[in-house]
Amino acid sequence: MAVNVYSTSVTSDNLSRHDMLAWINESLQLTLTKIEQLCSGAAYCQFMDMLFPGSVALKKVKFQAKLEHEYIQNFKVLQAGFKRMGVDKIIPVDKLVKGKFQDNFEFVQWFKKFFDANYDGKEYDPVAARQGQETVAPNLVAPVVNKPKKPLAPQRPIVAQRTPATPKGSTGMVKKAAGDDESAGLIEQINVLKLTVEDLEKERDFYFGKLRNIELICQENEGENDPVLQRIVEILYATDEGFVIPDEGAPQEEQEEY
């Protein structure tokens, strides 16, 4: 079982943000640049695996998490590990996943003390433990979309100007190469957008599932005439002005005619 740590006050033993990041990156062979990137919860899960092998289901941890519901899933894995090892600490998941510096810094300060109280110095291969999975910094993924805006094409006409004896046909080749670069950039951008759409669909399904669970609870207690419950139902079923709910009973053939 784990040795619990209850002190969270600021002391001279607390590491600075830079020293904290250096410790995390060295221990887990990561490349974090900001404390806020700990909001994914993945690093904490791996630290628990280092301290107490088998205490967390490391295979369930999403090391490339980019969305809030994926962060929440990682923290659920961490919570299960805490419970298994008797760690008496409430994880403020709702605050941590927002990626705010202060909340994440306070939690990692506590976690560092918890780690020091429980680490026995045994060797640990973090890369092998996560099966070689590369980690992705939560707030450094989006800029990838901008990469296609820097094509190599403008550099090529300069080369053509330095060789006046080049046949006219070479100009067409340069334009073709520039077109190929532009096409490759567009394809890369499309692939990034597809991944973004997939992530958004997962997030949509996640929140829809929550709303569905709330709806079921309201239906189960429908006869209690609770004004709060009735207000929740009104909010769930409220629609924007002009919105028309599709007629689910309409024949399939009629829909196909349009």
Curated annotation (Swiss-Prot):
One Gene Ontology biological process: negative regulation of microtubule polymerization
Keywords attached to this entry: Cell cycle, Cell division, Cytoplasm, Cytoskeleton, Golgi apparatus, Microtubule, Mitosis
Signal peptide: none
UniProt keyword annotation of Ribosomal protein present: no
Keyword Ligase among UniProt keywords: no
Chain segments annotated as transmembrane: none
All residue ranges annotated as the EB1 C-terminal domain in the record: 175-245
Residues in Calponin-homology (CH) domain copies: 14-116
UniProt xrefs under Pfam families: CH, EB1
Gene3D superfamilies reported in the protein's UniProt record: 1.20.5.1430, Calponin-like domain (1.10.418.10)
Location(s), subcellular: Cytoplasm, Cytoskeleton; Cytoplasm, Cytoskeleton, Microtubule organizing center, Centrosome; Golgi apparatus; Cytoplasm, Cytoskeleton, Spindle
GO CC entries: cell projection membrane; centrosome; ciliary basal body; cortical microtubule cytoskeleton; focal adhesion; Golgi apparatus; microtubule; microtubule plus-end
Recorded GO MF terms: identical protein binding; microtubule plus-end binding; protein serine/threonine kinase binding
Main localization category: cytoplasm
Function: Plus-end tracking protein (+TIP) that binds to the plus-end of microtubules and regulates the dynamics of the microtubule cytoskeleton. Promotes cytoplasmic microtubule nucleation and elongation. Involved in mitotic spindle positioning by stabilizing microtubules and promoting dynamic connection between astral microtubules and the cortex during mitotic chromosome segregation.
Similarity annotation: Belongs to the MAPRE family.
Protein name per its UniProtKB record: Microtubule-associated protein RP/EB family member 1
